[in-house]
């Protein structure tokens, strides 16, 4: 029997029908073996980061319970992105996208390998991630001991 972990996935989109796309992404994740979506934060309209000349984003976070490894969960996230029309590698790195699914946290695991870093390396810098994480779990603590609530106050 595989161990279940609480995982958090960042949701983002700034092209097309953003809300419908993010709703569909959550549905596809919920229908995936080894993944149970337990909560989804409020979706927030946010300004782009890193590449300003693009439409505003709709961002949120989904809380999952999963028995998938971090790598297997990331693979499923990338698969869902492809199913929803995302083509990685086109345009600027932080440019417009139909959908963006980021593995933010996977239990207490810390992973640093090619193509996968958990916790997400820019998690603590991004209010559009911290605010929905705090909404879903006001007591959430990162694997390094920092509390999301404290990061929001910084």
Which role does the model predict for each range below?
Residues 34, 49-57, 68-154:
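Flexible, gly/pro- and Lys/Arg-enriched active-site loops
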